A protein has these predicted regions:
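A short, structure-level motif marking secondary-structure boundaries and short turns
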Residues: 17-20, 146-147, 168
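Terminal substrate-recognition subdomain of acyl/acetyltransferases
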Residues: 1-76, 175-226
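A conserved beta-strand-loop-helix scaffold within acyl/acetyltransferase catalytic domains
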Residues: 44, 69-150, 162-164, 180
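Conserved GNAT acetyl-CoA-binding A-motif
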Residues: 165-177
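Glycine-rich acyl-CoA binding loop
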Residues: 150-158
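Residue-level preference for non-acidic, small/hydrophobic
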Residues: 37, 91, 158-161, 186
């Protein structure tokens, strides 16, 4: 993998404190094992990879409630990119419910190309963008309209995706980064592991404390234009 440090869009402070910030990107080379990159904490994004406090689950240890399996029978799914209209409709409802602002995935056609669409009574109610490798499944972004919250589509989606991943021979299910209190729930799922920067940890308490700390940090907008 070729590693790039972006010092143009990065910034630093050296007069009264030592601070250097630069985005770090990785570009896989022809012979790189993509599952090995995931194993070492890298996550894919468009044509580059990045390091993150990523979260994954050992598929051999995941257990699902009977209620989730029962509700899953009410949902039909199909592979393929949802229409722009459906993406906008579902993403808006999902963001309003969660209080999220960022739309970087929902506006990314490349990410949406590989999606699983979820239908209830013939209506598209949710979708997940994903990537599939030889031994790894990555759930990049999930969204649903919350019109029937009793369905708990998030649990059903995770059940279906885990089942498909196992059938494809995957060992791990990756769910991108674990930051802020909105990601606390990720530590409550069987088979949970998170990337510390040097190893995969099963320490739930430390992970939860870090997520809570994230939510206390305030970041002011930094204008890096020259």
């Amino acid at each position: 993998m070729k590693i790039i440090f972006d010092h143009i869009n990065g910034f630093g402070k050296i007069s009264n404190q030592d601070l250097i910030y630069a985005d770090v990107f990785g570009y896989p080379e022809i012979n790189d094992d993509l599952d090995e990159l995931l194993e070492n904490g890298w996550l894919p994004w468009n044509n580059y990879w990045f390091q993150s406090r990523s979260v994954r689950y050992d598929l051999s240890k995941i257990q699902f409630h009977k209620k989730t399996k029962k509700n899953a029978k009410k949902i039909e799914y199909q592979l393929g990119k949802p229409s722009n209209e459906d993406v906008d409709r579902i993403a808006k409802a999902y963001q309003n419910k969660k209080g999220f602002i960022s739309k970087h995935v929902f506006d990314n056609d490349l990410m949406l190309e590989n999606s699983i669409q979820y239908f209830y009574e013939s209506k598209l109610i949710g979708f997940v963008c994903y990537k599939l490798f030889k031994k790894s499944f990555i759930g990049i972004q999930f969204a649903w309209d919350y019109e029937k919250p009793q369905l708990s589509l998030g649990n059903i989606s995770f059940f279906i995706e885990s089942t498909l991943a196992k059938r494809s021979g995957c060992i791990y299910y990756y769910v991108m980064g674990g930051y802020e209190e909105c990601c606390l729930y990720k530590s409550e799922i069987d088979g949970f592991e998170w990337w510390t920067g040097k190893e995969w940890s099963k320490d739930k308490e430390l992970y939860q404390n870090l997520c809570k700390r994230d939510s206390l940090i305030e970041i002011k907008n930094v204008n890096c234009d020259i």
